[in-house]
Structures are given as structure tokens and as C-alpha cells.
Amino acid sequence: MTTLKAEKRDMQTKAKKLRREGFVTGNVFGREMKESMPIQIAKNDAERFFKTCTKGSKVTLEIEGQSIATLVKEIDYDSLKRQILEIDFQALVKGEKVHSVAEIVLLNHEKVNTGVVEKLLDEVSYRALPESLVEKIEVDVGDMKLGDSIKVKDLPIAADKDIDLLTDPETVVANVTAVHNTVEETAEEEAGETAQ
């Protein structure tokens, strides 16, 4: 599990001011916590963490000498400014199932030469105990052919008895569709209209 250093946040200081000072704000919450704990994380540490981790990742937060095993629940990201604004963490409790998501990563799509691989689902929603959490599902699509599709029920996570799948097993993850050459089709249509 990755470790991320954080500090308890003084709520007197506004989030905008903290961001200007190089921090990302966040909250830690959980069943065994009396109330959520506002935190701040150095912006550089948060950005480095999210180069390899994402929503659904497990992380140990080091907060003033205390280690808390958590799950990344939400990431508020400003895509225009390309910066992380806020992160919510759920404290994990041994023996308690938590709701999470696993990111779907397609592998070898460049090997498919009978069509184009179309990714239709980015993540799978599920419930599991902390020790059974899954961050990423890698799907090898290299052997797929035109007309083939992969559904959630075909993924390894669907066969895992320790995981309660929340996404519909019949949901299509990816399929291979025909390549349409729209420029040629448009030219042919225009030629047909002119001939009429």
C-alpha cells in the first residue's frame, strides 16, 4: 500500500489560500471515526501519488505520527487548471466491506486489425473487504475480432468470490467495430445526389 504524508488542516484557513500555498485539501471519514478529519497534503506529493494511483486506490495516510489505512473515494480535479482541488479518503475497517471502483485498462488494442476497439466502460463498481480491494482491471483485447465484445461478466473480477459486483454483469466493457471511412462515404453520397 502506498504511503502519503498529510497534516491536519486548520479550518480557519480557507481552501483557496492553502492551494495558493501549495497544498491540496482533503477529508478522512470512516465508521470508527467520530467525525471527518480535514487534512492538507503537499501538492507535489498529491500529484506524484496520482501519477500511479486513482479513485479506488488504497493508501496509508501518515498524519502527525498516526497511520491510517484508507481508500481514495473521490478526487475533485480542475481540468482547466490541471490541478487536484480536494481528495476524500475513507478509513478502512478490518472486516467491513466498502464500496469502491476498479479502473479498466485495455491492453494490446493496437494488435486488433479487423476493426477499431471501442472502450465503453471506464470502471467497475463493487463492494469488498479491505484485503480484497482491486484498483485496476487489465483486459487483453489483442485477440478480439470484428463484432467481438467483452462484458463485465467476462472480467476476472466477476469470478472473484470475495467481491460483490455492483455494475451490471451484462454491461459491455469493449467491442470491436468496423472502421468507417467517412470522407469517401460523404464523397459518394454527394456524387449520388449530383447525379439525381
Residue ranges and their predicted role:
Residues 1-196:
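Acidic, negatively charged sequence tracts
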